[in-house]
């Protein structure tokens, strides 16, 4: 076991600023590092395909070389991907589950080809209401995919907001999935903590910040924390609704984000914005990153 999952992601003492954003891969993934640089970041998250389609594009040699060259040029310390919105590894529908597993494996294969550090995945939905079976199916799908694809990419299970029949909205759910991963692959699995999802799922980062992280450490372990999605929320605490908002303009306010940025336990954990860009485009990311960095100067 690594001292901290961030070690697995490649964070080093040379990169103290661990703040970044989800950036566009329009025109090809090789353009993402320049877009991260444009907002002043050495941490990025991207999609390796259209997230609302089943089509699985190949990453050719030229694209791989171009991405690696641009990543080196812009000194990107941590680069990862988020998987497709269509994937549901908790589905009781056998056909959909197999489609999801194959798609997830293809996602992981593209990530490995690009030497990405992480692949974030939502645990999915147990649409029949059998959550225990859904968690088992999810673990099986992740295990099969990791067994099929060797490489540097770790899988990060994202905490969900708990809407509908979704699984993964509790720390216990995520730990059950982790424990269900085959022992030979479990070291490649960690957790992505989304602030909006956590608050919507009933983890009160506003009024009970310390207790939230104490529970995370007790149930999952801080050594499994690989990424934090830094998102404010449009909805109330424990609403079970997933709508991201600009930092400080939602129901979380700025204080939880200030505490996260200054929390020494989280200092080396990459943190990625998924906040609305609106008409401002990259300027919105710059503004959010400036706000977060400003907490360090008082």
Language-model-derived ranges and their functions:
Residues 2, 8, 175-298:
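Histidine-acidic metal/acid-base catalytic patches
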Residues 2-83, 87, 91-106, 298:
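N-terminal pre-domain/capping segments
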Residues 4, 89-190:
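Active-site acidic/histidine proton-transfer and metal-coordination neighborhood
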Residues 19, 79, 155, 191-192, ...:
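Residue-level marker for buried hydrophobic side chains located in beta-strands
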Residues 22-26, 49-51, 83-86, 124-126, ...:
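Active-site beta-loop-alpha junctions enriched in small/polar residues
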Residues 31, 62-69, 99-102, 106-113, ...:
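Alpha-helical scaffolding segments of alpha/beta enzyme cores, especially the outer helices
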Residues 34-40, 60-80, 107-115, 144-151, ...:
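Acidic (Asp/Glu)-rich catalytic clusters
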Residues 36, 82, 100, 111, ...:
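Conserved, mostly hydrophobic/aromatic
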């Amino acid at each position: 076991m690594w001292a901290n999952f961030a070690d697995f992601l490649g964070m080093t003492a040379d990169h103290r600023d661990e703040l970044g954003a989800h950036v566009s891969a329009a025109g090809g993934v090789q353009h993402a590092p320049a877009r991260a640089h444009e907002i002043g970041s050495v941490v990025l998250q991207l999609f390796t395909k259209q997230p609302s389609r089943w089509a699985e594009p190949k990453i050719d040699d030229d694209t791989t070389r171009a991405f690696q060259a641009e990543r080196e040029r812009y000194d990107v310390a941590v680069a990862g991907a988020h998987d497709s919105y269509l994937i549901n590894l908790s589905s009781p529908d056998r056909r959909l589950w197999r489609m999801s597993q194959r798609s997830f494996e293809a996602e992981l294969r593209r990530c490995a080809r690009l030497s990405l550090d992480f692949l974030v995945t939502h645990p999915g939905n147990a649409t029949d209401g059998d959550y225990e079976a859904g968690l088992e199916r999810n673990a099986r799908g992740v295990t099969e995919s990791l067994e099929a694809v060797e490489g540097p990419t770790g899988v990060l299970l994202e905490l969900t907001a708990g809407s509908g029949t979704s699984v993964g909205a509790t720390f216990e759910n995520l730990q059950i999935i982790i424990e269900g991963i085959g022992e030979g692959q479990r070291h490649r699995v960690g957790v992505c903590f989304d602030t909006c999802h956590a608050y919507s799922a009933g983890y009160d980062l506003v009024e009970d910040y310390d207790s939230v992280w104490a529970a995370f450490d007790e149930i999952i372990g801080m050594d499994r924390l690989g990424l934090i999605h830094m998102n404010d929320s449009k909805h109330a605490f424990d609403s079970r609704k997933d709508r991201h908002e600009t930092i400080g303009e939602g129901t979380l306010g700025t204080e939880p984000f200030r505490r996260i940025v200054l929390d020494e336990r989280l200092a080396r954990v990459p943190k990625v914005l998924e906040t609305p860009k609106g008409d401002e485009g990259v300027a919105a990311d710059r503004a959010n990153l400036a706000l977060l960095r400003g907490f360090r100067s008082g």
